[in-house]
Amino acid sequence: GIPQSADNPPWDGGFTWTKDKDNRDWIAVSCEGEGARIWWPNKDHITAEGDSVRMTYTVPSNLVAIGNGKLKNIKNMGEKTSYEWFVSNPINNYNISVQIGNYVSVQDTLIKDNQTHFMNHYVLDYNKELASNFFPQSKEVIRFYEKYFGDYQWYEDGYKLVEVPYLGMEHQSAVTYGNGFSIYNGVRSKSWPMYGV
């Protein structure tokens, strides 16, 4: 089939098909309003949560596919590569997302109660240095929210921010972020959900 395109993401659901500044494919899905049925078959009801989800995305080998949860396997098949992601916690279908692009990982850790939690953020390769200086602020935001609202619920599935070509959305364990690496604008507008906490 032909996947639905998003006219005004993330408010209008579907895929965003675009190019990055180096004219390479950059793809992301948002489906919070319409539901996940617009891009994959499922029992799409707000009360229906899978107790876990395993998703495999196969993309051209020059691209990387980022999903919710933890990366379990990468299988290179020559011209294509498959990325297997696994969410071990219950998740609403509309929170499941995929982002595809020339991503690199910016890794960090959060120490809490003598446990190390990994934070693997994914950004376009030419934004790695900028993101490396920006994303450490997400630890401060998580600590703030945990102080007032309780623990982050999905440490087992990790925490990541994924750069996208729209403003972003709070997908469980794979928060999409398109705010141009400017936390101060978000703080002023009280738009902290970009951190998904």
Feature annotation, model-predicted:
Residues G1-Y103, Q107:
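Extended, low-hydrophobicity, Ser/Thr/Pro/Gly-biased non-transmembrane segments
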Residues M55, E84, V104-V197:
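Juxtacatalytic substrate-recognition/specificity segment
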